[in-house]
Regions:
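Active-site gating/metal-coordination segments in enzymes
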Residues: 1-86
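Mid-to-C-terminal alpha-helical segments outside catalytic/metal-binding sites
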Residues: 32, 40, 158-159, 163-170, ...
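Catalytic pocket-lining loop regions of alpha/beta-barrel enzymes
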Residues: 44, 58-170
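Active-site glycine-centered loops adjacent to acidic/histidine catalytic or metal-binding residues
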Residues: 174
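Short, surface-exposed alpha-helical segments at coil->helix boundaries
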Residues: 2-3, 99-103, 181
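Active-site phosphate/pyrophosphate- and oxyanion-stabilizing loops and adjacent acidic/basic residues
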Residues: 3-6, 106-107, 158, 185
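Short, conserved catalytic or adaptor-binding loops enriched in Gly and charged residues
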Residues: 8-10, 136-140, 190-192
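Conserved beta-strand segments of alpha/beta enzyme cores
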Residues: 14-16, 116, 146, 200
């Protein structure tokens, strides 16, 4: 929860607390909660289109995105066509894995070209998303698109730096689906020979 992330950040300033919209609330209640979270120290917004069962371009996402975007705070969200539930889970029918498609990101960037946007997993880890996302960023000259490399190996981290530049790629973990140690090792393997790039990846770009 945001409250747990906030508590951790007060114990260790290296933690950067993000919050997320609660779509079970009314729109006004949701926005008031997000405004309170920002006042308490939320530094960014996280949305999970598949688990929260909502398109990132849905009107219910627009107000939270605008709130954070206009304040210059980053917006991140899951990218990738992924199942999260077993075939016999009742929750499987309550989600739509296609909400993770990269097309939604392209639409979002066209609508909010100046916001700081961080598509998770480099746009998705099914194959080809890094290249497609970087091509779209270059085509439209988006200045504030970053990628994080959770669920990515050393080769993909190097590819991300090549495609986006060392100032726009950052470390992340997809815990509990992977581990912090695994992601750290991949980052060190990819960038260990370049201390400047590695410092940006693990710390400064965030």
């Amino acid at each position: 929860s945001f409250e747990e992330a906030l508590a951790a950040s007060r114990l260790d300033s290296r933690y950067i607390p993000f919050t997320c919209p609660d779509f079970d609330l009314t729109d006004d209640e949701m926005m008031e909660k997000l405004k309170r979270d920002i006042a308490m120290g939320a530094k960014g917004l996280k949305i999970h289109p598949i688990i929260q069962n909502i398109e990132i371009t849905d009107k219910r996402c627009e107000r939270p995105i605008k709130l954070f975007g206009e304040l210059g705070l980053p917006i991140t969200y899951h990218c990738g066509v992924n199942d999260y539930y077993k075939p016999d889970s009742p929750y499987l029918k309550m989600t739509n894995l296609n909400y993770g498609k990269l097309d939604y990101t392209f639409e979002l960037l066209k609508k909010f070209p100046d916001y700081t946007i961080v598509p998770a997993h480099g746009g998705g880890s099914c194959g080809g998303e890094l290249e497609a996302l970087s091509a779209e960023v270059r085509k439209h000259n988006y200045k504030n698109v970053y990628v994080e490399t959770s669920h990515r190996g050393a080769a993909d981290i190097l590819k991300a730096v090549e495609l986006f530049g060392e100032d726009r790629v950052m470390y992340a973990t997809d815990w509990p689906f992977d581990t912090c140690d695994c992601n750290i090792r991949c980052g060190e393997e990819a960038l260990g020979n370049d201390p400047v790039a590695m410092d940006k990846y693990f710390y400064k770009n965030a």
